From Swiss-Prot:
The modification Phosphoserine is found at S77, S79. Residues 40-55, 101-111 have a biased composition (Gly residues). This is Motor neuron and pancreas homeobox protein 1. Residues 37-78, 101-120, 299-401 are annotated as: Disordered. PANTHER family: MOTOR NEURON AND PANCREAS HOMEOBOX PROTEIN, MOTOR NEURON AND PANCREAS HOMEOBOX PROTEIN 1. Signal peptide: none annotated. The lineage of its organism: Eukaryota, Metazoa, Chordata, Craniata, Vertebrata. It comes from Homo sapiens. Its main location: nucleus. The gene is MNX1. Residues 355-366 have a biased composition (Acidic residues). It is found in: Nucleus. Residues 241-300 bind DNA.
């Protein structure tokens, strides 16, 4: 008997430290894994429920005779899923913790001091722990990934939605089937990720065009751009890019003409002032003034050419009259001139009246019959006829008498 008692004491001493360690490790893991105060209190409740479950489960073993203490110690030792659930911070929703943790606490209170087991509560707590452990194994990809409905939104915000949300629904269904009080929270858990598997498909369909555009642009393909407002007009100009012509209003044209009359060239401050007052850009005002100056220069040149032509016409008529008055005096003083002198005079007149422009040359050719050279030529022909017939000569001699 003494040996058996010593064996029991040694066995109890050998097993008690793991029990204390397991009892302390679960609350420590729960406290360190939780950030919110409410979830911390729920974690304490969950720990109480687990301890209550263990005490309730070991109470029937204490009533039996101590025939197999090793089997009893093995039954009391925590199972690997429970350790995994404790270290992975497996916690349901806060409301869920209030109900389940409270039940576990009551079960622990009854089972601890009175050594009285409640089979229904103990079975529900054990099933809940097993289902939570299974859910933790299925969802434990991220740190704290096996948390309940309260942890899912935070987990989705930090790590994104898990690809397989059906494991959470399966764990919820298992827990709801074990205890009727746990069934209210799982439609919310299922509703938290109803369209979640389709999210990657939607993202892929939405980003397909952008991805295709980026790949094509990096590959060097020419992609269609947004059509310009004058793309059709540009295509009709044989590939030439031409800006549309600016349509000025009548008020703008009047003001621009007024400014052009005041000054043909605008300074930059004045150009800015005119452009601002007329709701135009400085480039538009500058180009309008350039075009207006070119038009003004062309009109000025045309007026000068018309004035020169008029002066030539007047000069040609006056020269013909003067030549007719001078010729009789020359004939009286010097006699009939030689034919070579007449030709040289005509050539000098042609060189003096010549103009590089064709229209003026044509005008000069039209005016040649009225020019001095033409009259001299006519007189020379008369003189040549007079040279051939000597009788008209005496007719000129009585004139000086």
């Amino acid at each position: 008997m003494e040996k058996s008692k010593n064996f029991r004491i040694d066995a109890l001493l050998a097993v008690d430290p793991p029990r204390a360690a397991s009892a302390q490790s679960a609350p420590l893991a729960l406290v360190t894994s939780l950030a919110a105060a409410a979830s911390g209190t729920g974690g304490g409740g969950g720990g109480g429920g687990a301890s209550g479950g263990t005490s309730g489960s070991c109470s029937p073993a204490s009533s039996e005779p101590p025939a197999a203490p090793a089997d009893r110690l093995r039954a009391e030792s925590p199972s690997p899923p429970r350790l995994l659930a404790a270290h992975c911070a497996l916690l349901p929703k806060p409301g869920f913790l209030g109900a389940g943790g409270g039940g576990g606490g009551t079960g622990g209170g009854h089972g601890g001091p009175h050594h009285h087991a409640h089979p229904g509560a103990a079975a529900a707590a054990a099933a809940a722990a097993a289902a939570a452990a299974a859910g933790g194994l299925a969802l434990g990809l991220h740190p704290g990934g096996a948390q309940g409905g309260a942890g899912l939104p935070a987990q989705a915000a930090l790590y994104g939605h898990p690809v397989y949300g059906y494991s959470a629904a399966a764990a919820a269904a298992a827990l709801a089937g074990q205890h009727p009080a746990l069934s209210y929270s799982y439609p919310q858990v299922q509703g938290a990720h109803p369209a979640h598997p389709a999210d990657p498909i939607k993202l892929g369909a939405g980003t397909f065009q952008l991805d295709q555009w980026l790949r094509a642009s990096t590959a060097g393909m020419i992609l269609p751009k947004m059509p310009d407002f004058n793309s059709q007009a540009q295509s009709n100009l044989l590939g030439k890019c031409r800006r549309p012509r600016t349509a000025f209003t009548s008020q703008q044209l009047l003001e621009l003409e007024h400014q052009f009359k005041l000054n043909k060239y605008l300074s930059r401050p004045k150009r800015f002032e005119v452009a601002t007052s007329l709701m135009l850009t400085e480039t538009q005002v500058k180009i309008w003034f350039q075009n207006r100056r070119m038009k003004w220069k062309r009109s000025k040149k045309a007026k000068e050419q018309a004035a020169q032509e008029a002066e030539k016409q007047k000069g040609g008529g006056g020269g013909a009259g003067k030549g007719g008055a001078e010729e009789p005096g020359a004939e009286e003083l010097l006699g009939p001139p030689a034919p070579g002198d007449k030709g040289s005079g005509r050539r000098l007149r042609d060189l003096r009246d010549s103009d590089p422009e064709e229209d003026e040359d044509e005008d000069d050719e039209d005016h040649f019959p009225y020019s001095n050279g033409a009259s001299v030529h006519a007189a020379s022909s008369d003189c040549s006829s007079e040279d051939d017939s000597p009788p008209p000569r005496p007719s000129h001699q009585p004139a000086p008498q």
